[in-house]
Structure formats: structure tokens, C-alpha cells
Amino acid sequence: MPSRLRXTRKLRGHVSHGHGRIGKHRKHPGGRGNAGGMHHHRINFDKYHXGYFG
């Protein structure tokens, strides 16, 4: 019964594997640990550690 695969076969090994690029299921959305502190996590840092980034 390989016919079940047809729809998704081409998506194997692709970043957005049948889920689209938004709301993708990644292991570490936002990077690991403090990654992006300077960039996309800056809001939180400013809120709690004001002036941490200069």
C-alpha cells in the first residue's frame, strides 16, 4: 500500500515538510540558550536588565 506516501513523498528532507514555513515545528525556535539576545530577544532583556546591551 505505497499509495499513502504519494502526497508527501516529494517533501522528504525539506525544511517545511508539509507544514508550511510559518508555525514550523523546530527543536529550538528562537535559537538555543541566549542566542539572539542582541536581536530577537532584545525586548525581554531590556525589560529586565535595562541597558545590558549598551
Swiss-Prot record:
The keyword Zinc-finger does not apply. Component of the large ribosomal subunit. The ribosome is a large ribonucleoprotein complex responsible for the synthesis of proteins in the cell. One of its GO terms (cellular component) is ribosome. The modification (3S)-3-hydroxyhistidine is found at residue 39. Belongs to the universal ribosomal protein uL15 family. This is Large ribosomal subunit protein uL15. Keywords: Acetylation, Cytoplasm, Hydroxylation, Ribonucleoprotein, Ribosomal protein. InterPro entries: Ribosomal_uL15/eL18_sf. Residues 1-30 have a biased composition (Basic residues). It comes from Sus scrofa. The keyword Zinc does not apply. The modification N6-acetyllysine is found at residue 47. It is found in: Cytoplasm. Component of the large ribosomal subunit. SUPFAM superfamilies: Ribosomal proteins L15p and L18e. Hydroxylated on His-39 by MINA. Residues 1-42 are annotated as: Disordered.
